[in-house]
Structure formats: C-alpha cells, structure tokens
Amino acid sequence: MPTLDDTDRAILHALQQNAKESYSTIAQSLEVSEGTIRFRIRKMLNAGIFDFIVHTDPKKIGLDVQAIIGINTRLGQQQHVALQLQTFEAVRFVGAFSGNHDLMIQAYFSTNDDLVSFINVDLAALEGILDVDVNVELMQYKDSFSY
C-alpha cells in the first residue's frame, strides 16, 4: 500500500467535503497542478485507498428502522455465520468484535415488523447462532464517512 503524504491527505479531505469538487478547484486550493490532482486521485483509486460511492439517507428511502444487533455464535461458527449474514439485503455491516458479542451487525428495515421477521425467521434459521441482542436506534447524532 502506498504511503500517503500531506498532499494526498489534503486531496482526500477535499473530496470528503465535496466529492463532486472539480480537480481544478482542488488544485487551486492546494496550489498544485490539475495534473497532480488527477494523477494522485487515480493512484489512490487504483490502490483501493478510497472509492466514489453514493451515500443515501436510509430514512429518505423508507428505511426508518436501524438496528445494531449483537450475535453470539457456537464455537468455531463465527465465520460461517458472518458469511451467511452478508447475504441479507437489510444487513449493511458485519464485523467480528471482542467483548460481549462475537459478531455485530447493522441492519435497516422499513418497519418494526420487518425487523421482527428478520430476527424470528431469518436469524432463527441460521445454523450456528446461539443468541442475539437487538438494539434499535432511537436518535442519531452523527453518521459520517470522514476520517
């Protein structure tokens, strides 16, 4: 993986503020050539350092229920369960953690009934799950992709 210098970090910061910013505007603000910006962005894209994605607001597309679900698995079944969880459209994030749960997932649903069905039907059918701990978001204070 290439090492990022101050210019690379400044480019990333500019894109995080406005991913549609023109290369010429970024170049002017950083006092470098537009070619430098184009080259650096292409290099970082090819290295997988970042990607351009569409970020949607779940609530504005009808996904009003967000749940963070802790999952405990049978010994030796963590990866098997994680791979199955990845296949569900509602599941946005799957990660293995230390602490009280083997896996944590973030999932979005249109209604509470959809969440209940996911737990009682979909998760209940998965081999290797011992128990789940469901936490429903009541209020969101921050959701950012910037680092």
Annotate each language-model stretch with its function:
Residues 1-147:
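A compositional/biophysical signature of low hydrophobicity enriched in polar/charged and small residues
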